[in-house]
């Protein structure tokens, strides 16, 4: 596997798209600097919003995402990958459908990654958390 930042980012996106959670997690260093742009307390409708630092936790994150969405209706797209040394920023749009209610949502995203020695040491994603929480909130009974 290449240690080039752009190559590692491309491989991450490929493995994520394939739904290969363990192989996706294998691209991450331990510990990983993990940040999702959500309030610290998270949201009860969005169970994957929690701290992560190990490969097992990273794999669990992607499994949880898949469990709550319809993979066949995923229309997430990447519009740009910007690389500066060990840093990369991936820009795009998340297009997902919630499995439980069939609610579709879209959100722009920016993903800041750092790659060192061929492993991802930073995973910071910024997305429209309000839109996502609203789409998943239909699963919660009042």
PLM-predicted stretches and their roles:
Residues 30-83:
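A solvent-exposed, acidic/Ser-Thr-rich amphipathic alpha-helical stretch
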Residues 1-30, 140-142:
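Short, low-complexity N-terminal intrinsically disordered segments enriched in polar/charged residues
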């Amino acid at each position: 596997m290449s240690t080039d930042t752009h190559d590692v980012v491309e491989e991450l996106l490929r493995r994520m798209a394939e739904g290969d959670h363990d192989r996706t997690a294998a691209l991450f260093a331990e510990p990983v600097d993990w940040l999702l742009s959500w309030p610290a307390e998270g949201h009860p409708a969005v169970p994957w919003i929690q701290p992560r630092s190990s490969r097992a936790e990273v794999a669990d994150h992607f499994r949880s995402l898949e469990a709550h969405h319809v993979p066949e209706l995923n229309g997430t797209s990447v519009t740009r990958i910007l690389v500066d040394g060990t840093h990369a920023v991936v820009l795009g749009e998340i297009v997902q459908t919630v499995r439980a209610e069939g609610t579709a949502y879209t959100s722009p995203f920016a993903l800041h990654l750092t790659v060192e020695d061929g492993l991802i040491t930073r995973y910071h994603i910024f997305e429209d958390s309000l839109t996502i929480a609203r789409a998943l909130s239909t699963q919660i009974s009042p």
